Amino acid sequence: MKKRKEVFGFRKSKVAKTLCGAVLGAALLAMVDQQVAAEETTKSNSTTNVAVTATGNPATNLPEAQGSASKEAEQSQNQAGETNGSIPVEVPKTDLDQAAKEAKSAGVNVVQDADVNKGTVKTAGEAAQKETEIKEDYTKQAEDIKKTTDQYKSDVAAHEAEVAKIKAKNQATKEQYEKDMAAHKAEVERINAANAASKAAYETKLAQYQAELKRVQEANATNEANYQAKLTAYKTELARVQKANADAKAAYEAAVAANNAANAALTAENTAIKKRNADAKADYEAKLAKYQADLAKYQKDLAEYPQKLKEYNEEQAKIKEALKKLEQDKNKDGHLTEPSAQSLVYDSEPDAKLSLTTEDGTLLKSSVVDEAFSKSTSKAKYDQKILQLDDLDIRGLEKADSATSTVELYGNIGNKSTWTTNVGNNTEVKWGSVLLKRGQSVTATYTNLQKTYYNGKKVSKIVYKYTVDKDSKFQNPSGNVWLGVFSDPTLGVFASAYTGQVEKDTSIFIKNEFTFYDENDQPINFDNALLSVASLNRENNSIEMAKDYTGKFVRISGSSIDEKDGKIYATKTLNFKKGQGGSRWTMYPNGQEGSGWDSSDAPNSWYGAGAVKISGQHNSITLGAISATLVVPSDSVMAVETGKKPNIWYSLNGKIRAVNVPKITKENPTPPVEPTAPQAPTYEVEKPLNPAPVAPNYEKEPTPPTPTPDQPEPNKPVEPTYEAIPTPPTDPVYQNLPTPPAVPTVHFRYYKLAVQPQVNKEIKNNNDVDIDKTLVAKQSVVKFQLKTADLPAGRAKTTSFVLVDPLPSGYQFNLEATKAASPGFDVSYDKATNTVTFKATAATLATFNADLTKSVATIYPTVVGQVLNDGATYKNNFTLTVNDAYGIKSNVVRVTTPGKPNDPDNPNNNYIKPTKVNKNENGVVIDGKTVLAGSTNYYELTWDLDQYKNDRSSADTIQKGFYYVDDYPEEALELRQDLVKITDANGNKVTGVSVDHYTSLEAAPQEVRDVLSKAGIRPKGAFQIFRADNPREFYDTYVKNGIDLKIVSPMVVKKQMGQTGGSYENQAYQIDFGNGYASNIVINNVPKINPKKDVTLTLDPADTNNVDGQTIPLNTVFNYRLIGGIIPADHSEELFEYNFYDDYDQTGDRYTGQYKVFAKVDITLKDGSVIKSGTDLTQHTTAEVDATKGALTIKFKEDFLRSVSIDSAFQAESYIQMKRIAAGTFENTYVNTVNKVAYASNTVRTTTPQAPRSEVPKRPTPVSYLTNKLSSAPATLPQTGTTDSSYMPYLGVIALLSVLGLGQLKRNEK
């Protein structure tokens, strides 16, 4: 397809014809714009009709999607920034022409270059700058030409003077050379004669020296030969003597060494004998002392053994009884779910001694620790004499001179004994410090233990190995972790990688490997000893947990701490603050009941604790803290992405937080064994030493010969120094004559310049605030300002100044408002093409042409209109044409309305969709589910505001207000306005929003009706409306920040719905800036509860024979069959109450004390198990009987009802055994109560005839009952009284429970 060239059309100008024709010719195109006034579209007198449009927004007014842009608008925007033509500018050049003329007269070669084009500039300012540049260049060219001309004249005069000077200088040089050459010749002749005389004298002396030297050398050689002969004889004799002496010495030293060795062996043997004798003596004395001590201890233990055994047995008996009680209470708050006695007593060791060793870490000086506390983030508390360990910036510990070889304790000790710490307040706390990196360890040994026992035996030593978990994600650049190891092992460790800044996605974990030792320094082999894991806090940004542990986790009932994926922490709820994230109590004291649980002496400290059973000699557990978002998905309540300090204080001890845990304090004694007396030793005898060897006599060494001294050699004569011949004078150099100056060439040029004035389009709201690339509400007034830059100085006269603006689709143009906002222009509007044209008036043109030598500021017109579509983008630019010679298209501006996903200018923009969901009391969504009468629906309404973030609507638009309408079904639901809660997306309480309730639209005030009418909303009946009290404050707080609001509006299902059953629906609307949007519709169904009553003679649920309305003989045993209402599957909330209340006529019927309850349908429990229809459920019920009033209540146990899955149906039937004791007609009705709502059954009626008086009553024969075919055992009725029954066993005493709300029901009297 060939692309058509887009052009502009102007009269008479070739430039204009290529740029602007399509815009001014747009009036020839017919495009229909079906816009209507905004106020007209909002009025409605019918029921709310939510249009489904291409916008994707459920709008109740102005629902139409934005139409396609006009061809003119698309063409104009595609050419944004294009220009054609320009305005020429001239600059004077008189001085340059004069300079060129004078240079030519002076003989300079003058050349005129081609003209230079200075280009086309965009603004008057740029044009003025270019003109200045051209003027300056013309001036510079003239100056350069004049300078060249003057220089050339000067150079010619200087050349002539220099030629005369050089000629005179060359003549003087020639005369001086001839004079110097004559003097040189005379000096050479004198030097040659003196050198010849010196040479003859030297040669005579040299001959005499050579003869004397020969004689001296011959005498010295003879003396040297004689000396060498004597020296040889001396050396031979010396060698012989030295060898003889050495041999004698070696023989003597060997004898001495052998003797010393023999004596050393004897001495060593004697020393060993002495030691063995001493050791034997010491061992005997030690054994004797030990025997005496053991004998005394044996006698003492033997006397104490019976008492210790008695105390041990008594304690074990108490523990056994306590464990029985704990087994019964194990499901109660604060009790161990696996009851056990605490065999490890390990609660406190304030006097323990601590030693630390590390192979790869760094032990720290206490002075360095003190200095670190006194600075940075811990300084404020330090100045208050408080050591706040979690505030310490550990960078203060990372110093070159911080290391020490042994542990140095620090804390509120010594000169800080009056200080406090966040670990023990005023209690003395001290610790040793070490720096470790990931994977590095420190070993801590605790001795001098006074209070620690296992199974009643004293623990003497504990060894811990603390290792920084290599998977810790703390962000300290140095990789260091500070461990403060407390001297009391029960206080544990404070670990920190805190560098003064909180961290996101961080963690710190320490592995603890530990072994306990007995008094014999042997490792203790634990057998299911309990170790406490307590104070495991979980906030919305942090989770403290234990992991990678030996042993088995034991949960405490009611505690927030549980085990998940091998980790111990608060798995389901937060436990920081009551009511947040499911927390039952607040961890710190705040005056509320149960607050302050995070303290070892709090009665509910078990809420943040658990226990681990450990066995064996060596155990380990890893503890630490981690950002919540690294454990669970990010959530505004349970896991927020805020920073935390990467540190933790944890302790491992035996202080189990569960209640009533018995401790084993008595050791199981063993019968003492009498010690054996030691045997006295036999001692060895020492051996004598050998005598020393005799020393040898040595030979004297010979005397060495003396050499004869050499005669000295004569001195050699010195050769004389000869006088050098002088250098002859240099040949003269004559200076050349200078070259005449060259004739210079100068160039000059002229310039060309043109201007293209720029344009700028701005988009404003009704408050004149720039809204380009931003967001404004639908129906907002949007203004387009068409601005042109200054016209330049030196321009031609302006004869026409025209601006053409093709407006965007969906923009409702206001012609009169535009004229008022655009003085100085004639305004015309073409509705077919949605184009507005502005032409400068004659007065405006006269202003532009008043002084053409100066630049002039232009005026601009303003387009006024409204945006009428959801999720729409309004783009716009315009065209300026000046004098049919210059044309330019402006920039494109755009503004968007909310309701448009994927908006590149406003990332938060998305569909405007208020939502409504129905939840039960546990927060489970129950949309579409069956709900029971009397239950509470917690409707959660979302006021969708996030798409308005960074909105720039004007004040008048904001004042239209913000409303939320809840159109609920009053025929089915009872509004609980007292329980309504409004929170923002961050969970904060919303203020400044009022709520009103109206029984109908007609009952609402006119102001409310107007708001709803303009928004196109008509509630079906009763409704509640939420409104922002101050629209401006509401807008500033929530709307422009894009913060959604959540309204929770509880409503109770009316009890009469259970009598009739049926479905009901619920819908809501939000109104923002006068624009309405509908939520989804929520539908629920209420089942009809229809209990039934029969009279039967058997206990078989399959037997449908009903004797209602028939005759029952006197003294007959029969059953009232109470069939409960059916609860459909997939219901919304747990069952907690399902009762049968039968107000029988005690004058004619007597309850035998027997009843039976069966499942009427298959029942699925939460654990997935299924109770088949017909199964005996009696064990899950209790009964209460009032024989005087004739009332019986059978109740299902609440824990059983709550174990039934909400996805399962539920129905039960009860058989109540009666005996007819009187004649007459008796009526009976029972009440089935389901979750506090009572439903009456049908009335049964039976008649018993009067027995003949003459007859002796026969002994009644019991009715034969069929067994339950679905049960493997015979069906028997449990007793609730003491009435005899020959065929049904006694099943125990049943607890009596009150009848909830049904005590006033009366039976029918005969």
From Swiss-Prot:
Q: Where in the cell is it found?
A: Secreted, Cell wall
Record's superkingdom? Bacteria
Q: Which InterPro entries match?
A: Adh_isopep-form_adh_dom (IPR026345), AgI/II_N (IPR041324), Antigen_C (IPR032300), Cross-wall-target_lipo_motif (IPR021197), Glucan-bd_C/Surface_Ag-I/II_V (IPR013574), LPXTG_anchor (IPR019931), SA_I/II_PAC_V_sf (IPR036234), Surface_Ag_I_II_A_rpt (IPR009578)
Residues excised as propeptide: 1281-1310
**Ag I/II A repeat residue numbers:** 146-220, 221-302
Signal peptide limits: 1-38
Q: Residue spans with biased composition (Polar residues)?
A: 43-60, 75-86
UniProt keywords, alphabetically = Cell wall, Peptidoglycan-anchor, Repeat, Secreted, Signal
- Motif (LPXTG sorting signal) on chain: 1277-1281
**Region: Disordered, residue numbers:** 40-90, 330-349, 663-736
Record PTM Pentaglycyl murein peptidoglycan amidated threonine, positions in chain: 1280
Which PROSITE patterns has this protein been placed in?
AG_I_II_AR, GRAM_POS_ANCHORING
Region entry V-region (lectin-like), spans = 297-668
Q: Which Gene3D superfamilies match?
A: 2.60.40.740, 6.10.250.2200, Major cell-surface adhesin PAc
The text of the family note is: Belongs to the antigen I/II family.
Instruction: Write down what this protein is called.
Output: Probable cell-surface antigen I/II
